[in-house]
Amino acid sequence: MHNKILILGNGFDLDLGLKSRYRDFMFSSTWKEKKRPASILSCNLLKYLEEKNEIEAWFDAESELLNYALKITQGTYWSLQKTDRDGHEFFQAMLKKYLLKEQEEFIPNNDSIAAKLMEAVIQNGFFDEIFTFNYTDLNKTLAKFRLNTRINTTYMHGSLEDSDNIILGIETDEAIHKDYQFLFKTNSRFYRYNSLIESMESADEIIFFGHSINGMDFPYFKDFFIKQSKSTAELKRKYITIFTYDDSSDQQIINNFREAGVNLRDLMQRNNMTFIETKYLREREKFELKKWNDLLIHLKDDSKDTQNNNLRRLSSMLT
């Protein structure tokens, strides 16, 4: 085995110690003390988002963007507003400003499971690619832990780089008023999708850390998991590890699979699939510790096999 990918969600940044929830941003001084341009002072989209400031997860915030767009389309909410596009751009700009500051100032969590996993990944050269749904710079956040990765990293929803934009939007098959189609993630030139699908299909091993596999991002994964649960001659058995927070988040992912038509029993039988709950791992619960240690041993053994195969290949080229 040699093709491994790592997929990161906001739970990864939270585990590192960043305050990167939707609620963290909405109650931050960056947002609360903002100076809103006169052109969007009466923007209904921003008013709607502020009413939802108790939401924690970003996938819930994106669901509210979809609800807003549907209500406008169906004529059951505020009337169509030309300032909503500008308000959406302003919201993204302020979020980027907040995260840039948080990225620089956050206090690293010394008990971070995410950092321990990345240390193992870096030291053993486990992974070929990283796909992150976070906006933060992976190298800059890991630098707080004196870690540096040169693994090829794809920022699925844009990044905090000056040359990049962040993407906060929707995915839906439902009809949306044409004036609100700016909310579609696929309309952004920074949207990156195809490379993830191709990498997941060709990978031997996939690790998810802190991704809810839920909400607006679920279409990325739905077809993949359905395919992996079916018995076909072309099916490649994969090692799939999902790091989630606790029983509740674990169950939420399982429920998402069921609702999407994924046969969980077949998925488990036809793949080496493991859930690791970081809350109980941090509490050193024996069952989670065993799964964690088994994963590290497996990755190290597999890394050695790959290195040995590479050495044999090089040797054969010289003889």
Language-model segments: which ranges?
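Conserved catalytic-core helix/loop/strand module for nucleotide-ribose chemistry
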Residues: 1-5, 10-205, 211-319
